[in-house]
Amino acid sequence: MSVSAFNRRWAAVILEALTRHGVRHICIAPGSRSTPLTLAAAENSAFIHHTHFDERGLGHLALGLAKVSKQPVAVIVTSGTAVANLYPALIEAGLTGEKLILLTADRPPELIDCGANQAIRQPGMFASHPTHSISLPRPTQDIPARWLVSTIDHALGTLHSGGVHINCPFAEPLYGEMDDTGLSWQQRLGDWWQDDKPWLREAPRLESEKQRDWFFWRQKRGVVVAGRMSAEEGKKVALWAQTLGWPLIGDVLSQTGQPLPCADLWLGNAKATSELQQAQIVVQLGSSLTGKRLLQWQASCEPEEYWIVDDIEGRLDPAHHRGRRLIANIADWLELHPAEKRQPWCVEIPRLAEQAMQAVIARRDAFGEAQLAHRISDYLPEQGQLFVGNSLVVRLIDALSQLPAGYPVYSNRGASGIDGLLSTAAGVQRASGKPTLAIVGDLSALYDLNALALLRQVSAPLILIVVNNNGGQIFSLLPTPKSERERFYLMPQNVHFEHAAAMFELKYHRPQNWQELETALADAWRTPTTTVIEMVVNDTDGAQTLQQLLAQVSHL
């Protein structure tokens, strides 16, 4: 009997089972213990293979692929700390709903807790973050193949969102020629190998029931809050709110067109919050709200009912309103709850939104990050997409810009970390094949710098704008102690990215004004490669501009 041959047959069943649940993209890091999984993936023509030498970046690459494809994406890593590097991407997927299948190779049980090399306690290491966790036994013909495939099917068939951790121990030898070992074991699955359906078919349960009193509530004064959703959902939500005559507060990730732009500015005006107090119901569609003033209003508002609609399970309301948590696909829910044509009930808010936007426009000429955030909609590629980083940049775009309705916007706003942003953007581009504009801060770019290796492989133009404000300037917006702010919060690195781009053979520009930036953008959109554009700005100008605008709009 060949151990290496049966390891590969065991792995082949696992990988083939994944294809029955829509897995097409598979991300692979180098490793020896994962050889059976890697070779099984390589031999399966159903997969599109992606590789990366850094497991943390690999997990985020898979996250980006899953965001766009809306299908589960598999990841293969070897044993040891390689597994732990998947933790950030797994956490993000659990909060934002992407489906990740983590196949982690492991040492067999007799090599755990005895000093063996690269052997750690992997089962359960992700605690409660995976939606499902499977700790497989070592491959053996004593366990029927139908148990293995149905175990995989059960986890994936009931997976609604988040990650699945499948721990796969393999004994040595890991290498060797294939022989007939385990062939009859594998063949007991019969014509399953020629089929395209799961061995065990289950379906996730998704609540989509119509609220019987909707006809009553749609006649009331309502507010629509739009969080993270798809581009198509964003357009439908905008039309739905317009028909109802309800004000729509659209997040940067809502893709609704933000008909009342600069919400995070005008929500700081007492006239706006006073008018919103008249709302009898708030319907929030989508989660992961960005704006600080929006979150403050959301926490303090007290309508008679607060409904949250999202297909992610669990509580999504940190303010714990009295109301309803409706687990449903947003588009499906809108169909079940049609709008009734009514006149808008808000008068003050549209005026404030217009005045806030005019205040922003009046400051758009200076070459700075706040102005870039406002102008970003002018720089979007046609038929393309936008990837927005975290920290200050996403807040500035949320507060100062107005993105087109239905234009795809992606970000990692679940745990809102700055790790893995470039890797996620790479996955977003690969899955879509679209021209992509990505914008991050300098610390975010440094954090995931080796992901520039992933950006060498793009199928359409990708522009990475690095806004270099020399540190974590978001802390300038917080009451951090001034005496320790630079040393312990901002942490300026005093670096530029020209040599990093050159190391990975990427095009690079450092524009000094808007004309140079626009020329660099126009050139970059002409070729299917990655261009790094570093925009060096005064350290605190972005944060100060936002604070000045907040003060100005609050007194309108």
UniProtKB/Swiss-Prot annotation:
Cofactor needs: Mg(2+); Mn(2+); thiamine diphosphate
Class of the enzyme per the UniProt entry, highest EC level: transferase
Gene Ontology biological process: menaquinone biosynthetic process
UniProt catalytic activity: isochorismate + 2-oxoglutarate + H(+) = 5-enolpyruvoyl-6-hydroxy-2-succinyl-cyclohex-3-ene-1-carboxylate + CO2
Co-factor binding details: Binds 1 thiamine pyrophosphate per subunit.
Protein's pathway: Quinol/quinone metabolism; 1,4-dihydroxy-2-naphthoate biosynthesis; 1,4-dihydroxy-2-naphthoate from chorismate: step 2/7; Quinol/quinone metabolism; menaquinone biosynthesis
Annotated InterPro entries: MenaQ_synth_MenD (IPR004433), MenD_middle (IPR032264), THDP-binding (IPR029061), Thiamin_PyroP_enz_TPP-bd_dom (IPR012001), TPP_enzyme_TPP-bd (IPR011766)
Its EC number(s): 2.2.1.9
Functional note: Catalyzes the thiamine diphosphate-dependent decarboxylation of 2-oxoglutarate and the subsequent addition of the resulting succinic semialdehyde-thiamine pyrophosphate anion to isochorismate to yield 2-succinyl-5-enolpyruvyl-6-hydroxy-3-cyclohexene-1-carboxylate (SEPHCHC).
Protein name: 2-succinyl-5-enolpyruvyl-6-hydroxy-3-cyclohexene-1-carboxylate synthase
Name of encoding gene: menD
